[in-house]
Swiss-Prot record:
Single Gene Ontology BP annotation: translation
SMART domains noted in UniProt: Ribosomal_S15
Protein name: Small ribosomal subunit protein uS15
InterPro entries hit by this protein: Ribosomal_uS15, Ribosomal_uS15_bac-type, uS15_NS1_RNA-bd_sf
Gene Ontology CC annotations of this record: cytosolic small ribosomal subunit
Native organism: Ectopseudomonas mendocina (strain ymp) (Pseudomonas mendocina)
Alphabetical UniProt keywords: Ribonucleoprotein, Ribosomal protein, RNA-binding, rRNA-binding
UniProt subunit comment: Part of the 30S ribosomal subunit. Forms a bridge to the 50S subunit in the 70S ribosome, contacting the 23S rRNA.
């Protein structure tokens, strides 16, 4: 259920801060959000897949940590990112 190479490249191009940027918090959060959304669809069809649910919870926690970091560093970038991604924080 991982993202394809094309999907990752599209997300990186959309959220990058500079050319060649793949590690900024915005890119990482956007990739995690796409993976989380894809896994949520998987759980609608496979409700008893507890092994994958653990991975989902890990991704959600990692995204939360990155968002907390970004909020502490630059609140304007944080606000813009959650607005673009449609997160409810």
């Amino acid at each position: 259920m991982a993202l394809s190479v094309e999907e990752k490249a599209q997300i990186v191009n959309e959220y990058k801060q500079a050319e060649g940027d793949t590690g900024s918090p915005e890119v990482q959060v956007a990739l995690l959000t796409a993976n989380i959304n894809k896994l949520q669809g998987h759980f609608k069809a496979n409700g008893k897949d507890h092994h994958s649910r653990r991975g989902l919870i890990r991704m959600v926690n990692q995204r939360r940590k990155l968002l907390d970091y970004l909020k502490g560093k630059d609140t304007t970038r944080y606000s813009a990112l959650i607005g673009r991604l449609g997160l409810r924080r």
